[in-house]
Amino acid sequence: YFSPSDTLDIYHAYYLAKYGHRGQVRKELNSDGNPTRYFEHVRRVAISLIDVLQIVDKNMIIAALLHDSIEDTEDLTPELLEHIFGTEIVSMIKLLSKVPKEGYIERLNNCHDWRVLAIKACDRLDNLKSLMIPGTTIEFQKKQVKETKEKYFPLFDRLCKECPKHHKNNVVFIRDE
């Protein structure tokens, strides 16, 4: 799938994400009953790109691994990430970041890069799957589902229209999941 150079870049992003999210946990519990490391979320998003959407684009995998780094870490700044990975990847990460939170959905609506929308679809799918954890309130679940239907479904419908033909069936699967 990936050249040795691309593989090294992905490993670099993987370990930077792991480092940047060190000590952070999500509400979901792992098999031991402990909170899941936050890093597992970004890892699952990247894996969804590969396994579900069958995308083997190095820049997309790196952006998926680092998609929450700007808003949720102190060490992984846009400047550092641009120095390491370049402008294209950091542009995707910035579009996926809720910094600033105001105008986030509007920025995604104005985004004309199907790759960003594909990463967001995998991100949202992972977030929705984690709603099934014990202790998540019905109110929070309903809020997340409503937000997904109102704000994200239009983006995912656009993704289905704008993605390359060879990804269309898999993208439709993510949207319908």
Stretches with model-predicted labels:
Residues 1-177:
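Active-site helical microenvironments for divalent-metal-assisted chemistry
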